[in-house]
Design a protein with these regions (language model features):
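Extreme N-terminal, non-catalytic leader segments
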Residues: 1-31
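The conserved Walker
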Residues: 40
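Conserved substrate/cofactor phosphate-moiety recognition/catalytic segment
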Residues: 46-99
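Glycine-rich phosphate-binding loop used to anchor ATP phosphates in small-molecule kinases
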Residues: 81-127
């Protein structure tokens, strides 16, 4: 790793190691990797929070970790790659050390998701991809409400402008995955992912 990457990983790990004391995301048989993907405002973090209420995971949330590295994020391509590069290193590190990880990020195209596929294969971790979507009018309303609420429980600064900039680059998930429309009741998909996790990833993702 180069010096900048080493520094970034160390800064992020300092934050994440503090989380381990409370989340205790070790699994009885083998670690699991859940990868959220979807545009800003589609409810990824809400789903992740609900999932970890039932199954212990260490959450790597890029919106949170981005601010560990960059005080005022600009969401540029270079910044994006810097954050994700460190996250990939940390995901692999925690999986190798027996922790189950939930990666809460946009993961909009197969180029970025391919890193996660490779990490899961290299570490032997079972992988579940959850693709979150919502109608544009729903997302726009959520982002507007989030911007207006200074006390909103979120690390994300992404607004409608960021959404419209990212939407054209989103690609379909090429592997079996869970399809989550957060404008509807999330309970059925949540139950499926919980069941998958409790089976140590033995249940087929569909």
């Amino acid at each position: 790793m180069d010096d900048q990457l080493n520094k970034d990983v160390a800064s992020m790990r300092e934050v994440l190691d503090q989380d381990l004391a409370t989340s205790q995301p070790r699994m009885p048989e083998q670690p699991l990797l859940v990868a959220m993907c979807g545009l800003p405002g589609t409810g990824k973090s809400y789903f992740a929070a609900k999932l970890t209420e039932q199954v212990p995971f260490l959450i790597l949330e890029t919106d949170r970790l981005r601010k560990v590295l960059v005080e005022h994020p600009k969401y540029t391509t270079g910044e994006h790659r810097r954050v994700f590069r460190s996250c990939y290193q940390l995901i692999q590190y925690y999986l190798i050390n027996g922790y189950s990880v939930l990666f809460d990020a946009t993961n909009l195209n197969e180029e970025f998701r391919a890193y996660l596929y490779d990490i899961a294969e290299a570490t032997g971790a079972r992988l579940a991809v959850v693709h979150a979507t919502a109608p544009q009018n729903t997302v726009r309303r959520r982002l507007k409400e989030r911007k207006a609420d200074r006390h909103a429980n979120t690390f994300s600064d992404a607004g409608w402008l960021i959404y419209t900039r990212l939407a054209p680059v989103e690609e379909p998930v090429q592997r079996d995955h869970y399809k989550l429309d957060t404008s509807k009741d999330i309970a059925p998909v949540l139950d499926q992912v919980v069941e998958w996790a409790r089976s140590s990833g033995q249940i087929k993702v569909d």
